[in-house]
Every structure is written in structure tokens, then in C-alpha cells.
Amino acid sequence: MWLFRSGEDGLPPIVLYHYTETRARYNAVDFLDGFSDGYLETDGYQGYNNLPGIRRCSCWAHTRRYFIDVVPKGKQYDYSNPAVQGVQFCSKLFEYERRSQNKKHTFEQRKAYRLEKEKPILDEFWSWLDEQKPRKGSRFET
């Protein structure tokens, strides 16, 4: 089962469920045929990679989960651990998203709020990420 949902643009969302017998990449390619020059926010499924005319965006909840999965279990948080730092970046973004939702921002207000509050966090995150050396075989290895 595939789920496609429109973005949060101030209009009522469009939600489409599409059943296929497999989750093969060609199903996404066929369904999204004609959708171009747009953004597609996805989970980590590799079948979405390199879809023609589409810029893929990662889901922050999934990104955060990848960091959480490698945080050492059963210990107090070690804030020098890169996985813990990655979780903290994501948590800051989620906190600002919650605040924006609680303030019931319009689409334009949310965009301005994100540029003011979240963009500096994202800029810092990307710089931090460039300095990291992911372990061989990890989801973050390029």
C-alpha cells in the first residue's frame, strides 16, 4: 500500500492510497508519472531515489529515528556522542514546529517562522553533518 499526501499549504489536504502487489520502484515511477519540478518528502525507502524531475526530501522523523537507533542504550546520554547530537538537532526542529502549530500560523506565517527560527538550526546541522565521519555501513555513509 502506498500513501501519497499533499503538502501543508493552507488548503485541505489531498490523501491518496494506491494499492500494488509489491513495493517495487516502478510502482512509484508509474504513479508519479507527470509529476515534475516538485518536492517529494519520503521515508528512507530507496525506491524513491532518482525519480525523474523530482527533488526528494527526507522525513525528519525518520532521520531522527536513524540517530536514535545508534544512541548507546542503557546509559546516561553522552552529549559528545554524534548520535545524541543528531537527535538534539532534530528535537529542536520538532519543538519549533510544535510552537508554530500551537500558534496556528497560516502557511505564510509558518514559512516566515521557519526561515527565522529553523533555518539557523538547519545551517548549523548541515555544517555539523559535514564534519562527521559515519561508520562504514551506516545509513549516513555516502
Q: Across the structure, where does each feature detected by a protein language model lie?
A:
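Catalytic center-proximal scaffold of phosphoryl-transfer enzymes
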Residues: 1-142
